[in-house]
A protein has these predicted regions:
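Short, well-structured N-terminal submotif of metal-dependent ribonuclease cores
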Residues: 1-38, 52-65, 107, 116, ...
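Generic structural signal for small/hydrophobic residues in well-ordered secondary structure
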Residues: 8-10, 45, 85, 104
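Alpha-helix capping/helix-boundary segments
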Residues: 11-12, 81, 100, 117-118
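Residue-level recognition of specific faces of alpha-helices
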Residues: 39, 84-87, 98, 103
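Acidic catalytic patch
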Residues: 60-90
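Acidic, PIN/NYN-like endoribonuclease modules and their adjacent C-terminal/linker elements
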Residues: 101-130
Length: 130
């Protein structure tokens, strides 16, 4: 798999609730696709929802609606993704973002994010649009 756009959790959340918060570059990428949502984003939403830090209603319904609304496919978290985390610099301590970075590297995706730390990882191994 390669050549698509992997959405950071914040992009998936903004796309549904406040698309005006997204940069023009991100909005254009979302229109052009193909778009991919990682189960890592779903996991992050479930955990934040269960702690009362995020209200998306039913997280499973949010996930299914997000896949549909963004015309996105679901990306599982595989052993190759886990292994790629080991080689990442310690720039970012967020385990969800580190997992998404690893997935972008392994799969050849461009990562869509508004996180200011993630572009510091960008290299010839993956691209970032923010």
């Amino acid at each position: 798999m390669s050549g698509g756009y992997l959405l950071d959790t914040n992009i998936a959340l903004f796309a549904a609730a406040a698309p005006e918060m997204l940069s023009r570059a991100v909005r254009n990428a979302l229109k052009n696709g193909p778009n991919v949502l990682s189960v890592i984003a779903f996991w992050e939403v479930v955990l934040k929802s269960s702690k009362g830090k995020l209200d998306v209603g039913d997280p499973l319904e949010w996930w299914e609606n997000s896949l549909n609304d963004l015309a996105a496919t679901s990306l599982p978290f595989r052993p190759a993704h886990v292994a790629a985390i080991r080689g990442l610099a310690n720039i970012h301590q967020d385990p969800f973002d580190r997992a998404l970075i690893a997935q972008a590297m392994v799969e050849g995706f461009t990562l869509l994010t508004s996180d200011e730390l993630i572009p510091k990882y960008a290299s010839a191994r993956f691209r970032v649009i923010g």
